[in-house]
Amino acid sequence: MESRKVTTQHLVKGEDLNHHGTLFAGRAAEWFVEAGFLAAAVWVPTENIVLVKINSMTFSRPVKRGAVLRLESEVVRAGRTSLEARIEGSAGGDVSLEGSITFVSVDAEGKPMPHGISALLQM
């Protein structure tokens, strides 16, 4: 399978912190979903992608103010209408969060439609 990884980076600022002074999970989730969306957008037009499920999002260490959180994402599985993206976030070289999300390709009425990329992912 051809690798089509997408990398995004975010500077963790004061407004991104929780009451413990570390990256707020809600902000991390926003960036996490955005990274997965960008990976899906490599394969499917953005107007056809909707989030169905955050399968998992696990934090393994806190991310502190001033850190640069690097999120790497790629589509790892495709069904007839769905795509699963795997995301890994690291700060200072250490993995801080990881997980996966599922998107579905939809038509103009919001109904699931085949995306036609399954064969490409098998290459």
Predicted stretch roles:
Residues M1-K53, D107-M123:
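Hot-dog-fold acyl-thioester-processing enzymes
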Residues E2-T7, K64-R65, V76-M123:
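HotDog/MaoC-like acyl-thioester-processing domains
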Residues Q9-K13, T58, T102:
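Generic structural detector for well-ordered beta-strands
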Residues F37-L83, D94-G99:
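Hydrophobic beta-strand-centered segment that forms part of the acyl-chain substrate-binding groove
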